[in-house]
């Protein structure tokens, strides 16, 4: 029997410790050649919604540890808004605002059978936060105890949980354009972690004095004020270099990416030689359909600068000892450009599936519904 697994099922079994362990093992498997993945690719097509565009995204990967292949697929209508403070963001919905469609399909690498269909929402937020947490574990100062958080949504929540799992965090300062959202985030996170969480009125106020700076936004323009980054800080982003302003790019000594080598690091991290499609997607490859009048609906991601390739380093080099990591307490380091999402969905999906089976959760349905006797 296969399983239909809801977000509620995933939340019952997947804690941050489990997620961090699965992500780290998945990364190491990938770098030593025991797992593989295809980076995220999007397909865009004109929509009947005059203010939006259809966006399909998919990514795949394997996990030898859990014996699974995972594909994560998402189907959205993307649209763009300008929020408080003038920050332009990309929003989305499926069918109607407030609903979303994202699925993880899990298959056995032992016999090929379909194992599960999972809602991706909760797992997605956890795996992104855990990935940043792994980077903090290896690259932030050991005494880092203050976080400057830009963003107050689910990604900002899981990032804070991950940081608290790998460092002794004492304080989080949070900024997002909507005051009630940052106030609620501060109140709820303080209750969850038992630490001081302060809502502040600007990104600069969040960043000042923080040893860990994290941007968790849907913005298509830079949000991190580089001049406010403290010496010795470690910076994480969910959108590669999109969230970094020119000063940030200039002050960061090394920008780590999870791509396996410098040649595989996307030009989208460098801000040069990118196609119209990449400028739309921001951090990954995209194929875009539409005439000029259709394409005019889609604003291009705005970057203020790209990294000199000499600043770009693969996390693989760090784990294998070819890169020293943090060399002193004053240098500013950063991580972004996650190109191994498929590995993460396979490893965290595999760990989650195992726990779901152990606890008897999920809804069973006949595997035969997904099989056929006609050769494809």
Predicted regions and their residues:
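N-terminal Rossmann-fold NAD(P) dinucleotide-binding loop
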Residues: 156-157
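N-terminal ligand-binding/catalytic initiation module
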Residues: 1-127, 131-133, 143, 343-346, ...
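Glycine-rich phosphate/pyrophosphate-binding beta-alpha loops
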Residues: 119-124, 237-244, 337-342
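Short helix-loop-beta connector
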Residues: 140-146, 168, 230-231
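Glycine-rich Rossmann-fold phosphate-binding loop(s) that bind the pyrophosphate
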Residues: 152-153
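Adenosine-phosphate binding glycine-rich loop
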Residues: 7-11, 246-376
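Rossmann-like adenosine-cofactor binding region
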Residues: 194-292
């Amino acid at each position: 029997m296969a399983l239909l697994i809801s977000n509620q099922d995933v939340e019952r079994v997947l804690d941050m410790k489990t997620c961090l362990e699965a992500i780290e093992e998945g990364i190491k498997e990938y770098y030593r050649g025991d797992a593989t993945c295809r980076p995220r690719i999007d397909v865009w097509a004109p929509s009947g919604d005059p203010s939006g565009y259809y966006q399909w995204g998919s990514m795949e990967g394997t996990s030898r540890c859990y014996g699974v292949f995972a594909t994560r697929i998402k189907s959205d209508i993307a649209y763009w808004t300008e929020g408080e403070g003038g920050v332009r963001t990309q929003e989305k919905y499926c069918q109607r605002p407030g609903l979303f469609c994202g699925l993880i399909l899990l298959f056995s690498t032992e016999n090929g059978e379909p194992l599960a269909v999972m809602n991706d929402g909760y797992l997605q937020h956890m795996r992104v936060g855990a990935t940043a947490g792994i980077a903090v574990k290896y690259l932030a100062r050991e005494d880092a105890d203050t976080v400057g958080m830009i963003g107050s949504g689910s990604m900002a929540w899981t990032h804070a949980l991950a940081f608290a799992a790998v460092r002794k965090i004492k304080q989080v300062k949070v900024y997002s354009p909507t005051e009630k959202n940052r106030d609620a985030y501060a109140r709820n996170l303080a209750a969850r972690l038992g630490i001081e969480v302060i809502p502040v009125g600007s990104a600069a106020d969040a960043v000042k004095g923080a040893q860990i700076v994290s941007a968790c936004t849907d913005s298509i323009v830079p949000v991190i004020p580089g001049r406010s980054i403290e010496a010795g800080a470690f910076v994480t982003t969910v959108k590669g270099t999109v969230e970094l302003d020119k000063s940030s790019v200039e002050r960061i000594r090394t920008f780590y990416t999870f791509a396996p080598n410098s040649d595989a690091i996307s030009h989208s991290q460098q801000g040069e030689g990118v196609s119209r499609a990449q400028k739309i997607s921001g951090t990954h490859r995209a194929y875009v359909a539409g005439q000029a009048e259709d394409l005019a609906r889609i604003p291009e991601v705005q970057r203020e600068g790209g990294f000199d390739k000499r600043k770009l380093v693969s996390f693989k080099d760090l784990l294998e000892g070819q890169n020293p990591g943090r060399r002193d307490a004053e240098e500013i380091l950063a991580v972004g450009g996650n190109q191994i999402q498929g590995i993460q969905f396979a490893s965290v999906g595999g760990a989650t599936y195992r726990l779901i089976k152990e606890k008897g959760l999920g809804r069973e349905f006949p595997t035969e519904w997904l099989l056929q006797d006609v050769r494809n």
